[in-house]
A protein has these predicted regions:
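Phosphate-binding glycine-rich loop
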Residues: 50-97, 111-113, 121-122, 170-174
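N-terminal "arm"/small-domain region of PLP-dependent enzymes with the aminotransferase-like
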Residues: 4, 13-51, 55, 273, ...
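Active-site PLP attachment segment
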Residues: 194, 207-257, 283
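Hydrophobic/aromatic ligand-binding patch that stacks against planar heteroaromatic rings
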Residues: 110-112, 204, 284
């Protein structure tokens, strides 16, 4: 039976595989996928007596670098901290400007404010969740120190286009610090919170941008409960070990030795090079990540199966689904974004509420930054970002995770058909 046929069977209440599929289910939006392997790894950390930053964190960094085909990873307690430390490592601060997308979560933009710089928001391209590459070039000034593109839903941005756009205005680039002088254009610091394991044009996420941050929050594909990391491509002239040491200093008060280094006999002496921050990852978090990373290829494969099942089952509804896979790219399959074509915000909101009544938790990704109080207070007006508003107005995110069975996905598909038909019959537009 085809996916569409299965969805129709669900809607009619027929039995499939001996189970009544029209019985109301509870489909959570994005629960963590925790197996015995994660429990054992965390228990091992607890038994070891070493629970803060230590050997498991360092191993996790090495394993992430191997997985992503990069030279180095630096782990933090969040992707937000990773982004902030990346900006600080470039010397970005007051008086500087950093461009990012208007269509993202606040964590892409708040680090710009944290370092004292000014966020410059860019609209997305028409009908796209990606930053408008042509508009980026027009926003670059002599104050621009970095661009933060966002890999929404795990789909990597077109970094070739972004680089070309920045190279077209390289005459405005004014490097000030030794690290900035390694670039002949504005550096790209990617928000890859969603895109660990994604590939585009033959490059893994982490290799396409100059710097890439990742999130391991509880709802991400790979979780450490809370956590994040930063990696970077091999940049001619960049001393990766020096950069790593600087990032570690930033993450631990500027202290020259972490707790693990101080355990060596006679190694108690330390210095504080500058007043840094406190955003290090712990071994308990890393232990969870180590087990998750070993399972990650299988988790990515399962996500792809679910995405493709959605694509088949929703093909006859006016849902514009984000494209996760193509001839030269594969996303991490993080979020199932769907735009209900021709629908209003009223219809979208009613759709989410009705799906909730059927036991299916849905969400919206994202409310554009200019609609949020904090960014309104900075002077941003949603009228200046019409494409972001259009993407948001009829977007709904369906459950997508590795705890979903085939029957669960078929149930969601069936309920999408039922709820869409119900609202349309009521005249909701």
């Amino acid at each position: 039976m085809t996916a569409r046929g299965r969805a129709a069977a669900c809607a009619k209440g027929r039995r499939k595989d001996g189970m009544l599929v029209n019985v109301k289910r509870n489909i959570p939006f994005s629960p963590p996928d925790i197996s015995q392997a994660e429990i054992d790894e965390v228990a091992d950390a607890l038994r070891s007596g070493w629970i803060t930053t230590g050997p498991k964190t360092k191993q996790f960094e090495r394993d992430l670098a191997e997985f992503s085909h990069t030279t180095r990873f630096a782990c933090f307690n969040s992707a937000t901290a990773a982004l902030e430390c990346a900006l600080r490592s470039l010397g970005i601060g007051p008086g500087d400007e950093v461009i990012t997308s208007a269509y993202t979560y606040t964590a892409s933009a708040s680090p710009i404010l944290h370092v004292g710089a000014t966020p410059v928001l860019c609209d997305v391209a028409p009908g796209s969740f990606e930053i408008d590459y042509d508009q980026v070039a027009g926003l670059v000034t002599e104050k621009t120190r970095a661009v933060i593109p966002v890999d929404v839903a795990g789909v990597m941005c077109d970094y070739d286009r972004l680089r070309a756009a920045l190279e077209s205005v390289s005459g405005k680039w004014r490097p000030r610090t030794p690290r900035e002088e390694l670039f002949d254009r504005v550096p790209i610091v990617a928000d890859g919170a969603h895109s660990l394991g994604a590939v585009c044009h033959g490059l893994h996420s982490g290799l396409a941008a100059d710097f890439t941050s990742f999130s391991f929050h509880a709802v991400k594909n790979l979780t450490t409960a809370e956590g994040g990391a930063l990696t970077w491509r091999d940049i001619p002239g960049l001393d990766s070990e020096e950069l790593y040491r600087d990032l570690m200093l930033m993450s631990l008060h500027g202290q020259t030795k972490d707790a693990l280094a101080k355990t060596r006999v006679g190694a108690w002496e330390y210095d504080v090079a500058f007043c840094g921050w406190k955003c290090n990852m712990t071994d308990l978090q890393a232990a969870l990540g180590l087990a998750q990373l070993r399972r990650y290829p299988g988790l990515l494969a399962r996500r792809r199966e679910n995405v493709e099942r959605y694509e088949r089952g929703l093909a006859d509804l006016p849902f514009a689904l984000i494209k996760h896979y193509g001839d030269d790219f594969a996303s991490s399959g993080h979020l199932m974004l769907a735009r209900i074509e021709g629908a209003s915000q009223e219809f979208r909101n009613a759709f989410i509420n009705e799906m909730g009544e059927e036991g299916v938790a849905c969400n919206v990704h994202y409310k554009p930054l200019p609609l949020l109080t904090a960014y309104k207070g900075l002077g941003f007006d949603i009228a200046d970002f019409p494409n972001a508003l259009a993407q948001f107005s009829n977007e709904v995110t369906l459950p997508l995770h590795t705890k979903l069975s085939d029957d669960d996905v078929d149930y969601v598909i069936a309920k999408c058909h039922e709820v869409f038909a119900k609202l349309s019959a009521k005249g909701v537009r």
